[in-house]
């Protein structure tokens, strides 16, 4: 019996052919994907549509879309490097580092402390590692910052300033002043009343003056206290014709306050017209005013740890915390309590307010002894030196006295000034007590104080001859 093969309908054969073609096309696409699995990063895959693609996306998730909307987090190093574009603090190297302010309290000049900033970053183990800072300029010294600055001659190194300004635009006028000094015809002399003794080189200034400050350098200084730079000198030991005829050695190591006073330029019109910094007197205010310096006149402060310090306090200056140790001059409080009853006590210092004001808040928190406080911003800057022009007080100068260990500080009112020996640590010092009888007598006389001060201390006799 012969079996006959049944032929399929044309429609069924057409459907089978279509299925076969689809399978071939599918396999060929898979082969192409295996042969070239990598695609260009900028080409996006074709997005499928329809119910089937929706189910696939729901199960697998749209990774490409998530990658575009939520890119991978950057590392901390990458973020810090980008932040260098907006930060105001320059960083060293490519590796981010956290600067840490450190205070070093070892010193080399006259036993006084120094402070400087060390750029460091934290290791992974938590220890500090020094990094040399090549982009940041070195921090300026404390010389002329927190404490009273050092006074300078009108030396060639300081030609760029003029009265009231230390800008480089006035160099010509400063040169003329230097020429007028005629240094070759002046004898080298030891400083009197305020600067007698050996010279002490300072950091960044040609001389060490009596202008109060000691620890203002940022270099290491030897661990010993400053010996007094002042000694009482009789007015008769002033200048003579023999001194003027002798040769002066231009070593710039000895600072004479009276030579400075002799050649100080006059006040400018702007400085003469400054508004008074103090309020008007009240009925309870004493008639006479007594202006007192701070550093080396009433106290001695240091960044070195002082075993005999009467008090200590921190000072924040230029983002660095400094620990200040304070010695009080003998009879400091007794002098203030006695003088505050008959004088309007005014503190006038060339130190920074951030330091001096905090110290006075500790010593006299209720302002019972010192009625007013003036700081460096109230001084007149002359050739880079700060001078205390008493006109800024707004007080009658015939009834105003200033006591300062630096006579050059009251260069513009020499007849109002009483020099006092600089004090550092002498526990037997009685200079404040010695002034009490004279000051009380001035109030009792109720006269112009200037002739009495001039006759008593004769500072004009210490000025060099013309």
Curated annotation (Swiss-Prot):
Cite the InterPro entries for this sequence.
Dullard_phosphatase, FCP1_dom, HAD-like_sf, HAD_sf, TIM50
Q: Which residues form the FCP1 homology domain?
A: 283-442
Gene Ontology molecular functions? phosphoprotein phosphatase activity
Q: What is its EC number?
A: 3.1.3.-
Per its UniProt record, what Pfam families does this chain match?
NIF
Q: Which UniProt keywords apply?
A: Hydrolase, Protein phosphatase
Annotated Acidic residues bias? 30-39
The cross-references to CDD domains, in alphabetical order and at most eight, read: HAD_FCP1-like
The region called Disordered is annotated at 1-111, 189-238
EC main group: hydrolase
Positions with biased composition (Polar residues):
50-62, 189-199
Q: Has keyword Hydrolase?
A: yes
Bias type Basic and acidic residues, positions: 63-82
Q: What function does this protein fulfil?
A: Probable phosphatase.
The similarity comment for this entry is: Belongs to the CTDSPL2 family.
Instruction: State the name under which the record lists this protein.
Output: CTD small phosphatase-like protein 2-A
The gene from which this protein is expressed is ctdspl2-a
């Amino acid at each position: 019996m012969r079996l006959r093969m049944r032929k399929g309908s044309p429609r069924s054969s057409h459907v089978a052919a279509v299925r076969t073609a689809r399978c071939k096309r599918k396999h060929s696409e898979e082969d192409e994907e295996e042969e070239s699995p990598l695609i260009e990063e900028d080409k996006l895959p074709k997005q499928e549509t329809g119910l089937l693609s929706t189910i696939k996306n729901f199960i697998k998730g749209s990774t490409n879309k998530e990658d575009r909307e939520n890119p991978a987090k950057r590392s901390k190093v990458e973020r810090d490097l980008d932040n260098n574009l907006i930060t105001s603090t320059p960083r060293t190297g490519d590796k981010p580092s956290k600067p840490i302010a450190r205070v070093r309290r070892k010193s080399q000049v006259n036993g006084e402390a120094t402070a400087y900033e060390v750029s460091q970053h934290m290791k992974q183990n938590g220890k500090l590692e020094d990094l040399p800072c090549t982009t940041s300029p070195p921090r300026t010294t404390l010389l002329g910052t927190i404490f009273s600055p050092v006074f300078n001659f009108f030396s060639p190194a300081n030609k760029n300033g003029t009265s009231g300004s230390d800008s480089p635009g006035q160099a010509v006028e400063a040169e003329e002043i230097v020429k007028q000094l005629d240094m070759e015809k002046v004898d080298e002399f030891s400083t009197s009343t305020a600067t007698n003794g050996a010279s002490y080189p300072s950091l960044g200034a040609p001389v060490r003056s009596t202008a109060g400050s000691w620890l203002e350098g940022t270099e290491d200084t030897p661990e010993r206290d400053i010996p007094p730079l002042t000694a009482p000198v009789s007015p008769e030991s002033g200048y003579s014709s023999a001194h003027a005829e002798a040769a002066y050695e231009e070593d710039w190591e000895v600072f004479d306050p009276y030579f400075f006073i002799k050649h100080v330029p006059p006040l400018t019109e702007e400085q003469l017209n400054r508004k008074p910094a103090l309020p008007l007197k009240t009925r309870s205010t004493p008639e006479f005013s007594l202006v007192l310096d701070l550093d080396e006149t009433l106290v001695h402060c240091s960044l070195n740890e002082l075993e005999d310090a009467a008090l200590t306090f921190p000072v924040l200056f230029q983002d660095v915390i400094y620990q200040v140790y304070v010695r009080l001059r003998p009879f400091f409080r007794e002098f203030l309590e006695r003088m505050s009853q008959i004088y309007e006590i005014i503190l006038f210092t060339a130190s920074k307010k951030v330091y001096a004001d905090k110290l006075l808040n500790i010593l006299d928190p209720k302002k019972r002894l010192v009625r007013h406080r003036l700081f460096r911003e109230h001084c007149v800057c002359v050739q880079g030196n700060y001078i205390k022009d008493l006109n800024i007080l707004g007080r009658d100068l015939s009834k105003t006295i200033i006591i300062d260990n630096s006579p050059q500080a009251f260069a513009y009112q020499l007849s109002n000034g009483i020099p006092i020996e600089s004090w550092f640590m002498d526990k037997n010092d009685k200079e404040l007590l010695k002034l009490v009888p004279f000051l009380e007598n001035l109030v009792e006389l109720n006269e112009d104080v200037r002739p009495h001060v001039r006759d008593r201390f004769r500072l004009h006799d210490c000025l060099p001859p013309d």
